[in-house]
Amino acid sequence: MTNIKFVWEFFGPDSKNLSIHHLAHLKEFLSFEKIKSFDSSFSVESVNFSYSYIVVQSKYLDNIKLKLKPHKAFKA
């Protein structure tokens, strides 16, 4: 089965803290919905740009798109 990487982007000087905080909520959602994550983390690309992400099976695509509204999604 294909895995999908969902990405949420944050901009500005507080982007790192926002992506870390958002990741905590993503993990809570995965636990509540009983969705297994293959990877979940955040990345700091510059002082003004960071993102948080999760990698899950593609069968959860519609559920996550509808409830969490990711900014981007890629095949992982």
Predicted regions and their residues:
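Long, contiguous binding/interaction regions
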Residues: M1-A76
